[in-house]
């Protein structure tokens, strides 16, 4: 047991340091191609690169370990100090991804066939997960790798709607203008705005507004973007119609949309992850998340799915991203124990 732990931690140091050294903000995932080619050769895992998204698929099988290789922007020089590794993506989600790669390698060595994916664009519009759903892939089980503190199993995510609104008006000299597009639209924003308060209540949040071209002329055009979040028990169409009714004189376009997801606590992946943690004397928690993940998309190609991963979720997207190699080991062990159970019952 101790020998296996040291092997996993040593391999994690090597692989995670390599991957953190490669800058892969969304849409730049091809930077990691040589890394995945090396993994494929070293671990004897077949490599497929999805052509449209540049997502990486390793191995074969009916069970998928799915994480993502892209990060938010902002490179952080990786370093290791006292069994802690720092760098952009250490938590979200290169740490979970490396845990999955090591788990897949060890499982395949035991004859348990598992696929692992480093999907693209999760931090943007999830084109990697979307491409996977369009390629006729279907899996008996999927575990999504996102930081969940090494103890939490995510069974629910909210959905999102990204809305662009374009408004127009007659420009006037600002010294004598009778109307102002900025003022008029600002009033409507305040009326439709729903502050994020709790999970079950939807939020409608303006995130971008652009208008005006001259210091002394009221704007002729205004661009506005809303980020809408809603739980599975909220009515999507009601939210869209509420915004449409408020901005009747403007054009509205849905530029991206992700459905909410909620899975039964009795689905096989949830139960196997729960038992895997209990076997390590770790008390699992079933949680729901206010954001979205690739789980929202990948629910289309399986009936058994949940999200779990090592890493402190409070450090996601911060300049303090770090993860310990003990956390990585717990992640590897949890994935392996869960998949061994799922494999035996298949």
UniProtKB/Swiss-Prot annotation:
It is found in: Cytoplasm. Catalyzes the release of L-lysine from [LysW]-gamma-L-lysine and the release of L-ornithine from [LysW]-L-ornithine. Keywords: Amino-acid biosynthesis, Arginine biosynthesis, Cobalt, Cytoplasm, Hydrolase, Lysine biosynthesis, Metal-binding, Zinc. Zn(2+) 1 binds at residues 68, 92, 146. The active site is at 70, 122 (proton acceptor). Binds 2 Zn(2+) or Co(2+) ions per subunit. It catalyses: [amino-group carrier protein]-C-terminal-gamma-(L-lysyl)-L-glutamate + H2O = [amino-group carrier protein]-C-terminal-L-glutamate + L-lysine; [amino-group carrier protein]-C-terminal-gamma-(L-ornithyl)-L-glutamate + H2O = [amino-group carrier protein]-C-terminal-L-glutamate + L-ornithine. Signal peptide: none annotated. The keyword Transmembrane does not apply. One of its GO terms (cellular component) is cytoplasm. Its EC number is 3.5.1.130, 3.5.1.132. Pfam families: M20_dimer (PF07687), Peptidase_M20 (PF01546). Pathway: Amino-acid biosynthesis; L-lysine biosynthesis via AAA pathway; L-lysine from L-alpha-aminoadipate (Thermus route): step 5/5; Amino-acid biosynthesis; L-arginine biosynthesis. GO terms for biological process: arginine biosynthetic process via ornithine; L-arginine biosynthetic process; lysine biosynthetic process via aminoadipic acid. Gene3D superfamilies: 3.30.70.360, Zn peptidases (3.40.630.10). It comes from the Archaea. This is [LysW]-lysine/[LysW]-ornithine hydrolase. GO terms for molecular function: cobalt ion binding; hydrolase activity, acting on carbon-nitrogen (but not peptide) bonds, in linear amides; zinc ion binding. Zn(2+) 2 binds at residues 92, 123, 317. Its cofactor is Zn(2+); Co(2+). Belongs to the peptidase M20A family. LysK subfamily. It comes from Saccharolobus islandicus (strain M.16.27).
């Amino acid at each position: 047991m101790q020998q296996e732990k040291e092997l996993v931690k040593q391999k994690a140091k090597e692989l995670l340091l390599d991957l953190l050294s490669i800058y892969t903000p969304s849409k730049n995932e091809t930077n990691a191609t040589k890394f995945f080619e090396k993994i494929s050769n070293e671990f004897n895992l077949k490599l497929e690169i999805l052509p449209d998204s540049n997502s990486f698929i390793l191995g074969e099988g009916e069970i998928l370990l799915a994480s993502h290789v892209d990060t938010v922007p902002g490179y952080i020089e990786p370093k290791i100090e006292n069994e802690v590794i720092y760098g952009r993506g250490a938590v979200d989600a290169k740490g979970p991804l490396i845990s999955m790669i090591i788990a897949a390698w060890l499982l395949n060595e035991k004859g348990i066939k598992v696929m692992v994916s480093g999907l693209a664009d999760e931090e943007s519009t999830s084109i990697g997960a979307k491409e996977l759903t369009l390629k006729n892939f279907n899996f008996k089980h999927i575990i999504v790798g996102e930081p969940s503190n090494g103890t939490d199993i995510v069974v629910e995510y909210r959905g999102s709607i990204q809305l662009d609104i374009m408004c127009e008006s007659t420009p006037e000299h600002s010294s004598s203008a009778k109307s102002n597009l900025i003022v008029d639209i600002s009033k409507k924003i305040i009326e439709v705005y729903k502050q994020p308060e709790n999970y079950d209540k939807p939020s409608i949040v303006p995130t971008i507004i652009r208008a005006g071209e001259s210091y002394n002329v009221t704007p002729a055009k205004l661009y506005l973007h809303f980020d809408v979040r809603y739980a599975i028990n909220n009515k999507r169409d009601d939210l869209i119609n509420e915004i449409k009714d408020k901005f009747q004189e403007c054009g509205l376009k849905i530029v991206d949309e992700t459905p909410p997801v909620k899975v039964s606590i009795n689905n096989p992946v949830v139960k196997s992850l729960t038992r895997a943690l209990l076997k390590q004397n770790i008390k699992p928690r079933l949680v729901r998340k206010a954001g979205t993940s690739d789980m929202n998309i990948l629910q289309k190609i399986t009936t058994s799915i949940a999200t779990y991963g090592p890493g402190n979720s409070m450090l996601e997207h911060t300049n303090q991203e770090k993860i310990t190699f003990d956390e990585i080991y717990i992640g590897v062990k949890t994935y392996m124990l869960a998949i061994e159970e799922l494999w035996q019952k298949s």
